[in-house]
Amino acid sequence: MNKSFLSFINIFLFLLLFHGAGISSEVKREVLRFSSDTAQIKKSDGILHLSGEVKITYGQYVIRSGLLMAKTNSINSPEVKIIEASKNIYFSNNKDISAKGDKLFMDVDKKFVSIEGNVEFSQGKSIIRAEKINVDLVTETVDFEGIKDSFIKN
């Protein structure tokens, strides 16, 4: 079988499993939209694996990576609860902030994001490099750990 046919089958199965092109979360009923080179579903565990040129949009937020795993609360629930990503992480609010790093963890219900490993957070012309950042998406508060070689431009 060719690669595009297998990719089509994986996406079709995902759509059947999660009942639509987006996955809704219980909090504010935001829709997770995604694209990737490949997708694999483990229905028995409620886990979706995406790889290659992965892009997820959740409300105003964008996550790009090489590998991404989305977990539901249970096999009977289409709502994604946890997102974990690795390989060339990029996170943005589509306004004024973006961050790059090695690994990302997002709790969709709590609207919390953690990025770690060679993190580069930028806002405007300012760049803060750190080992880890934690972002509260509700209050838009960012906590930094292990800051190094950073600058803030007014």
Please tell me what each predicted stretch does:
Residues 1-154:
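Mature-chain termini and adjacent capping regions
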